[in-house]
């Protein structure tokens, strides 16, 4: 009998479940489908065989990416090889995603099944998963799902910063909108200022230049020879400046009030600022296209290439389109109208704005548009899937389109595609090596700057951390100096050594010891008196600045102590002699 197992992928790990022996037909009954909602009844049908938790969120993200791409991860392979029976013919594995099922069947040899009964079982497992796995709560499972969802979405959205085509889509859309707005506002300025100076409309055709002139001239009656030089700077043409000056003198326009002029000038300044922003945005779009799709922009131009990417949705979608779709991209209405009325289908869409189709003869427009769409499809695929995109292939493809145009006009045979691509491959490798070399240099410079910055921060932090310790050391030194200063000046009394308490002796022993001490002390006094006087003389010579009173004051406690000792000893001896 074939054993049915079910693989369930969760944010916390893989779960392998086994179905108890129940007929497949009975599982599809409505009563059984309702029993899926009941945990107790669901346990009678399904049991957990093994659970392989993910060690970290990064591992969970890797497994989720592998499942979405239809690749068998090593963790999944280990789980299936460990817990599924060795006899693969007797095992039927139910999975939710057909891609991962096909990959498991191809790599591991297990028969996989999706849909029907498996979908109902997975619905029940998804509902009761936190009860099937021990130690897993509903709250922790929800948190794991939320974290994995955020990281998975972030990985899908996060691409190379230099190759994000979303910025191109937004830029070209804004550029088209700005063109419409500038055109509308310029026409409003022409109508508004035309009541005062109608001849200026015929002389100047450019919208931005007209708005600058309206802002500069103001009241035409104030225009004179002194402003002619400024007019030449704005119009970039001396003849036009002279014509404007002559027309202002003999204009048939009506007079205008000061408040109306103020409003016209403020509105024309807004239009001028919009036109300047449009130029800066166009420059930004060109630089972005050279980074994201250099071959496509070299072949067909930045504006047309950006419109193709925006219409397709992304550069990847454009690369997936065949040449026939690229040819009519942007002409969907005409295409479906032609299919509906069974008329002629359009020959070109957005690529009509390319210069090649405009240069071709009427009978060759369809042929050159088909050839150009083919080259655009190749260029978009090169830009999308090359590691280091360069404009070499786009330049070579442009040369091929030029040769095909000349072939249609003059009959000159173009070069073979194989020869052109060989040259392009060699040049592209050299260009890619040069780009990688520049990038490595930039990275080294950035790392050096980062190291210097970190070293400066570490030095500053070490200085800040050492300052309190240094302050404490200075404070301790100052305290020590304060303590030592009175001793050096002799103002502080030296510590007096108190006589140690001696044990009481017998009276005879005390008398004998007192007599011996008296004899020895008298002998010492006689010997030490001349030496002390001699020894005191060098000290006085060495320190002549110290006053004698202070020195005597510092010596008085020792003398007083010796004198009190000798007097007490004499009194004790006299008392003992009287008692005897």
From Swiss-Prot:
The modification Phosphothreonine is found at residues 467, 545-546. Its main location: nucleus. The keyword Chaperone does not apply. One of its GO terms (cellular component) is nucleoplasm. The modification Phosphoserine is found at residues 314, 465-466, 513, 522, 528, 536, 543, 554, 567. The modification Omega-N-methylarginine is found at residue 359. GO terms for molecular function: histone methyltransferase binding; RNA binding; snoRNA binding. Residues 567-580 have a biased composition (Basic residues). Widely expressed, with highest levels in the central nervous system (CNS), including cerebral cortex and cerebellum, and spleen. In the CNS, expressed in Purkinje cells of the cerebellum, as well as in motor neurons of the hypoglossal nucleus and in the spinal cord anterior horn (at protein level). InterPro entries: Nop56/Nop58 (IPR045056), NOP58/56_N (IPR012974), Nop_C (IPR042239), Nop_dom (IPR002687), Nop_dom_sf (IPR036070), NOSIC (IPR012976). Involved in the early to middle stages of 60S ribosomal subunit biogenesis. Required for the biogenesis of box C/D snoRNAs such U3, U8 and U14 snoRNAs. Part of the small subunit (SSU) processome, first precursor of the small eukaryotic ribosomal subunit. During the assembly of the SSU processome in the nucleolus, many ribosome biogenesis factors, an RNA chaperone and ribosomal proteins associate with the nascent pre-rRNA and work in concert to generate RNA folding, modifications, rearrangements and cleavage as well as targeted degradation of pre-ribosomal RNA by the RNA exosome. Part of a large pre-ribosomal ribonucleoprotein (RNP) complex, that consists of at least 62 ribosomal proteins, 45 nonribosomal proteins and both pre-rRNA and mature rRNA species. Within this complex directly interacts with TCOF1 in an RNA-independent manner. Core component of box C/D small nucleolar ribonucleoprotein (snoRNP) particles; the core proteins SNU13, NOP56, NOP58 and FBL or FBLL1 assemble stepwise onto the snoRNA. Interacts with NOP1 and NOP58. Interacts with NUFIP1, RUVBL1 and RUVBL2; RUVBL1:RUVBL2 seem to bridge the association of NOP56 with NUFIP1. PANTHER family: NUCLEOLAR PROTEIN 5 NUCLEOLAR PROTEIN NOP5 NOP58 (PTHR10894), NUCLEOLAR PROTEIN 56 (PTHR10894:SF0). This is Nucleolar protein 56. It comes from Mus musculus.
